[in-house]
From Swiss-Prot:
The modification Phosphothreonine is found at T82, T233. The gene is Fh. Homotetramer. Interacts with H2AZ1. This is Fumarate hydratase, mitochondrial. It comes from Mus musculus (Mouse). It holds the Pfam family Lyase_1. There are 2 substrate-binding sites: the catalytic A site, and the non-catalytic B site that may play a role in the transfer of substrate or product between the active site and the solvent. Alternatively, the B site may bind allosteric effectors.
Length: 507
């Protein structure tokens, strides 16, 4: 993949989530209102003093964020470190802020300032500054605090690069320069789409493709294994184990098709819409140029959204993508359940599949082994279904010119993409590739099945065939014995007409 995608993948592997206490280095304290021209560095307790429009706040000297970030940590103490804004969103912001700085330089932003912003934004995109983003998802529904967290971090890092004083907002101002031609209302949805697209391409689709390929290989491996089918969990007519697995292959294939079909709307970026979609305080061409820069940085086909009012006020694209993932979760739930039920036993279940044994299954029953990968996959599927409910509620609550469920929506979309991608890889590596067919058990169950009688329908009719099946079941006899005893056909006729290998498709 392209440069930014490689950097994002590398940064995720190196990600360290600090404790909630380390994030803000203690309780922030509100000081008397004033707006100094430069920040006053506090000599005690390793704080510096910064200000926002509400007044002064103490900021840890070892952090690049500023007053608005500190104020958010004071106002939204919800959930702790585990509820932080997803790092993919922060890294997407880094990509966006770099692209905006490039375009703003074309429109007259001081090249020295633009260059420093771009370098700092690159560090954000690469995950080098993850420790400086302490805010939780549960904040303003527009994501304004996170946008300002990004602006402050990039501003202070750029100031440091230029030899200035942290918190001074000189020579790089978080609003006037880093956020130039932007609003939280268009930057956050842009970052949402960038993050979602990257996660889909880096994690979700590769995971599903791996699972698809493994299931396809098993379908071919089991092509000659004839088994009894089941409908309503009851015996049905035969099919091959390969045919059964081919259904799973198609489900995963369609899952990828649906996800890819949702991506063109994800590639549309809100950047340039600013506050309500009109593009106030931007230059003509800014939106198109930013989208092109983001596309170049990520290697993904991003374009400017054709209607910025829709891009800010509604997030139907994310609901659509979440819906595709929800459908994938339904498919994976069915596949995992089928495989674990077919592997149930080892002596008292169906036992048609032999599943890999990966770890002890019980703290009290010696020798017990469980279908743990199937269980993990079904739990992931359930979580994704729940995530989609939240995304659906969020998407339906765009009021007037702005949807204010943005952070919650992207948190759940990214969570679903990551879980499905990772679970698909785990399920493939630790279960699917090691599945074996228990042909002895499969043959035994098939030969005992009463539904082989269906092959007699064209020869003796439905009613007589049903009589054979019911009588055989009642008496505990075989179909062949019962058919002969009832006088409906000879042994030779039964052997000629009831052949499982001839019951696998149309004639």
């Amino acid at each position: 993949m392209y440069r930014a995608l490689r950097l994002l993948a590398r940064s995720r592997r190196l990600l360290r989530v600090p404790s909630a206490g380390a994030a803000v280095s203690g309780e922030a304290t509100t000081l008397p209102r004033c707006a100094p021209n430069v920040a006053r560095m506090a000599s005690q307790n390793s704080f510096r003093v910064e200000f926002d429009t509400f007044g002064e706040l103490k900021v840890p000297t070892d952090k690049y964020y500023g007053a608005q970030t500190v104020r958010s940590t004071m106002n939204f103490k919800i959930g702790g470190a585990t509820e932080r804004m997803p790092i993919p969103v922060i890294q997407a912001f880094g990509i966006l802020k770099r692209a905006a700085a490039e375009v703003n330089q074309e429109y007259g932003l001081d090249p020295k300032i633009a260059s420093a912003i771009m370098k700092a934004a690159d560090e954000v995109a690469e995950g080098k500054l993850n420790d400086h983003f302490p805010l939780v998802v549960w904040q303003t529904g527009s994501g304004t605090q996170t946008n300002m967290n990004v602006n402050e971090v990039i501003s202070n890092r750029a100031i440091e690069m230029l030899g200035g004083e942290l918190g001074s907002k000189k020579p790089v101002h978080p609003n006037d320069h880093v956020n130039k031609s932007q609003s939280s209302n268009d930057t956050f949805p842009t970052a949402m789409h960038i993050a979602a697209a990257v996660e889909v391409h880096k994690v979700l689709l590769p995971g599903l493709q791996k699972l698809h390929d493994a299931l396809s290989a098993k379908s071919k491996e089991f092509a000659q294994v004839i088994k009894i089918g089941r409908t309503h969990t009851q015996d049905a007519v035969p099919l091959t184990l390969g045919q059964e697995f081919s259904g799973y292959v198609q489900q995963v294939q369609y899952a990828m098709v649906r996800i890819k079909a949702a991506m063109p709307r994800i590639y549309e970026l809100a950047a340039g819409g600013t506050a309500v979609g009109t593009g106030l305080n931007t230059r003509i061409g800014f939106a198109e140029k930013v989208a092109a820069k983001v596309a170049a940085l990520t290697g993904l086909p991003f374009v400017t959204a054709p209607n910025k009012f829709e891009a800010l006020a509604a997030h139907d694209a994310l609901v659509e993508l979440s819906g595709a993932m929800n459908t994938a979760a339904c498919s994976l739930m069915k596949i995992a359940n089928d495989i674990r039920f077919l592997g149930s036993g080892p002596r008292s279940g169906l036992g048609e599949l032999i599943l890999p044994e990966n770890e002890p299954g019980s703290s009290i029953m010696p020798g017990k082994v469980n279908p743990t990968q199937c269980e993990a996959m079904t739990m992931v599927a359930a979580q994704v279904m729940g995530n989609h409910v939240a995304v659906t509620v969020g998407g339906s609550n765009g009021h007037f010119e702005l949807n204010v469920f943005k952070p919650m929506m992207i948190k759940n979309v990214l969570h679903s993409a990551r879980l499905l991608g990772d679970a698909s890889v785990s399920f493939t590596d630790n279960c699917v590739v090691g599945i074996q067919a228990n042909t002895e058990r499969i043959n035994k169950l098939m030969n005992e099945s009463l539904m082989l009688v269906t092959a007699l329908n064209p020869h003796i009719g439905y009613d007589k065939a049903a009589k054979i099946a019911k009588t055989a079941h009642k008496n505990g006899s075989t179909l062949k014995e019962t058919a002969i005893e009832l006088g409906y056909l000879t042994a030779e006729q039964f052997d000629e007409w009831v052949k499982p290998k001839d019951m696998l498709g149309p004639k």
